[in-house]
Amino acid sequence: MKNVSPSYLKHHFLIAMPHMADPNFAHTLTYIVEHTANGAMGLVVNRPQELNLADILEQLRPDIDPPALCQHVPIFIGGPVQTDRGFVLHPAGKTFQATVELEGDLALSTSQDVLFAIADGVGPAKSVITLGYAGWEAGQLEAELADNAWLTCPYDADILFNTSSELRLEAAARHLGINLSLLTSQAGHA
């Protein structure tokens, strides 16, 4: 008997299908940070919230006025879990107090010093800052994939860092040769 290992989606994007009913994930593009037999963790990368980096810095270091450029650095809703916890996806190279190197020259930092470095102009030139994350229990993401809730797409740094947030979902679908507006959840009958 052939031993088949499961296929995990670490370092991929999840594209929410147009019929996604969960309001936390409708019309989202999610980067999968980790996916194992024990579950998965991802960050929604196309849902900016009202906050910007200046707002966060005012809370973290109230004695220093944030640079004006920080007002133009969006903070994304990374998912519904631990929405007060920050995550910063950025190109690998610079490391901070809590930086994990991911695949494909990508890194994830979770310490405040990365935010200060970005604000002070010495941090990563490109980044996606989120509050919260998306989490799936063992088998949950696999079940959602089997129910056609998601499409999967290989990670592409250009989509994450060089595409405006409102165009990332469509860009990932285009990467697969798909137009999301033409998809349906209904099966056809021949």
Swiss-Prot record:
Cystine bridges: none
Cellular-component GO terms for this entry: cytosol
A Pfam family of this chain: DUF179
Coiled-coil region: none
InterPro entries with a match to the protein in the record: AlgH-like
Family designation: Belongs to the UPF0301 (AlgH) family.
PANTHER family: UNCHARACTERIZED PROTEIN YQGE, UPF0301 PROTEIN YQGE
Protein name per UniProt: UPF0301 protein Pfl01_5311
Record organism: Pseudomonas fluorescens (strain Pf0-1)
Source lineage: Bacteria, Pseudomonadati, Pseudomonadota, Gammaproteobacteria, Pseudomonadales
